[in-house]
């Protein structure tokens, strides 16, 4: 409901040389005597890069491997990890957009949330009146910047009586480059109301 308070818990599930797995639990904020209502869970993978060279950094070399003290592999997160989104040859170009100032983050890259908004905008409001977004996966492949043109390819990969699943690929053209480069792959699973 509007104005309900909620809490996001987060923890590092695992760490590898260049990546960490971080889990999330979203639940209602309650008094200490009440059981918190769980609204959902999330999983993410993060990479550490040198902000000047844009190259990966060995996480275990930072502060003598301090990250190991923050790993909690015992805390449950009952959703499946993301899988690699596989696009078939049937993906159709459904939209092309230009990118502007409001699409970028402080580093000058297209903001992660903007990619998600643009993907969700591929489905009209009437679709959302009859379908609930049950699962959303996104993988960032390359960076894009203000002025790049983004192309959205959509493919329905599964349809059952109560479920529809779509794979989405986003490519870019730079200002002076006609070649398309893949920047994002995503999967959206909807449940019919």
Label each residue range with its predicted role:
Residues 1-80, 140-149, 155-193:
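HotDog/MaoC-like acyl-thioester-processing domains
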Residues 135:
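Phosphate-/nucleic-acid-contacting segments
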Residues 47-132, 193:
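Hot-dog-fold acyl-thioester-processing enzymes
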């Amino acid at each position: 409901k509007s104005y309900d308070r909620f809490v996001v818990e987060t923890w590092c599930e695992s760490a590898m040389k260049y990546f960490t797995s971080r889990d999330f639990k979203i639940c209602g904020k309650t008094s200490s005597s009440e059981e918190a209502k769980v609204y959902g869970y999330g999983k993410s993978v993060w990479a550490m890069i040198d902000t000047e060279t844009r190259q990966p950094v060995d996480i275990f070399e930072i502060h003598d491997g301090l990250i190991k003290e923050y790993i909690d592999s015992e805390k449950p997160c009952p959703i499946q990890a993301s899988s690699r989104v596989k696009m078939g040859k049937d993906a159709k170009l459904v939209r092309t957009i230009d990118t502007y100032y409001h699409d970028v983050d402080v580093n000058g890259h297209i903001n992660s949330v903007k990619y998600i908004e643009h993907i969700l905008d591929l489905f009209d409001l009437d679709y959302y009146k009859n379908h609930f977004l049950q699962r959303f996966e996104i993988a960032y492949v390359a960076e894009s910047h203000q002025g790049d043109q983004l192309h959205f390819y959509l493919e329905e990969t599964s349809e059952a009586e109560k479920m529809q699943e779509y794979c989405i690929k986003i490519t870019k053209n730079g200002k002076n480059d006609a070649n398309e480069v893949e920047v994002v792959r995503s999967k959206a699973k909807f449940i019919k109301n």
